[in-house]
Curated annotation (Swiss-Prot):
Protein name: Heavy metal-associated isoprenylated plant protein 41
Domain HMA: 376-444
CC annotations in GO: cytoplasm
Organism: Arabidopsis thaliana (Mouse-ear cress)
Residues making up the propeptide: 513-515
Gene: HIPP41
Protein role: Heavy-metal-binding protein.
Protein's UniProt keywords contain Metal-binding: yes
Cysteine methyl ester found at: 512
Keywords tagged on the record: Lipoprotein, Metal-binding, Methylation, Prenylation
Amino acid sequence: MAMRELSQLNRDSDGDEEVWVKHYSSNHQILLVGEGDFSFSHSLATLFGSASNICASSLDSYDVVVRKYKKARSNLKTLKRLGALLLHGVDATTLHFHPDLRYRRFDRVIFNFPHAGFHGRESDSSLIRKHRELVFGFFNGASRLLRANGEVHVSHKNKAPFSEWNLEELASRCFLVLIQRVAFEKNNYPGYENKRGDGRRCDQPFLLGECSTFKFRFSRVAKELYAEKVRSREVKERESMYPEAILNKQPVSFDHRYRLQTEFEAIAGTITLGKSKILWLSQEKGHLHWIFVTTKNVDVYSSKIPVFLICTLESRQRDIACFVKTFQFKLVKNHYPNTLTAGVEFLVKFITGKYEECQQVTYLRKNFSGYGDGNKQRIVLKMDMSDEKSMKKAMKIASAKPGVRSVSIQGQNDQLVLLGEGIDLAELTRELKKKVCMTTIITVQAAPPQQPPQPHPMGQYNQMPPARRCTCEIPNSGFCGFCRSMSQPNYQVVPSPYYPPMLYCRDETDGCRIL
């Protein structure tokens, strides 16, 4: 009864019994790593009344375990009877490669008092390094075996030299964040005996002293921040090693399966530097050239000429986008989604590598002869729109994007057709996927030119002819039962194998037969 008093019983509405032992529930899938005589897992299983949710593992084989520890055989027998999964020869640093663990996910992964072995004094830097390598390997493997909201628990001593292991720093390198640190009390787990596990006194307990249980949880935000940090470091290294090759490097080609709207086409312009210098911006064979020209007699018609850079360089052409990325963060996109524009002073500093920070940014309209009505687009997006509400929402999102002139639904209510120019397709697709449903790009092409209205064949007043009964009622022929005069060739009726009825009729010049 004393053991039962230590557990908390929670009964849900279905009558099933959930047993809590400190931080662990009978409904949790629990993995225990580095078990000595399996007394900790035996304690949990006894309090739960079942071990079907427990997977207990040890580094030693079964024969070594029962030879080292006196109570190991009885503990293993009890765990097996209660339904536990017992694994031997499991390396704590390669959990995610173990064939019995790599495809399983757990709510709690527990490692009590990790230790790399007694190979000297605990204060030796070499031994501390071995301990840290062991714990880091465990964190790396355990973080890959967690369920959503799963936790990694490590019980550890608080005082030096054990505090020099710095568990929080090791966990952060595996994108695990500390969510709680609670005192470890051995009395909460009746029957648990901590063992030295190595040497002649392997079955003897060691002094615990002041200990804590560190609870860690996987953080996707930490992983994304680390990836961004690595990318920025690589960009800085590339800039420092090859400062001149960044602007003149050939853009990387990608097979997008559709034509990008933001390629280097017809990009040309001038930027005035004072009164005599001009920076000429031009495009040739995929390269973007910056040329300084010195002249005295220059007709400077404006101090700010609309020069722009393509914003999709950041996502489509990584190798030359390192400058553009900085440029994009400092200079927010204007109302034209496919371009970034800036004042002359800002752009010159940026191009010449002297850019630090510019407080005033002037937004300019792009005004090149190469970009006009000839850049209209027709975009077809395939969407899984199941109801009318999702259709309306998709059309509302698309119509609000800059550059979109018309939006329509075609096909079996699964194709969103857009007409316009300068549409930011990547941003639109991303927003539709997030707010409506899965979206796939089918085609991106130039919109066909608008045809002038054709005069109706019925004449100036477009009069409706009188209704007439005709014989052109062939399925899928495009004619209706009471057809109007259409500029089509004479229709050939396939003769019937049966003898036709006697009909009196006359043929009209427009191809209809009047009964």
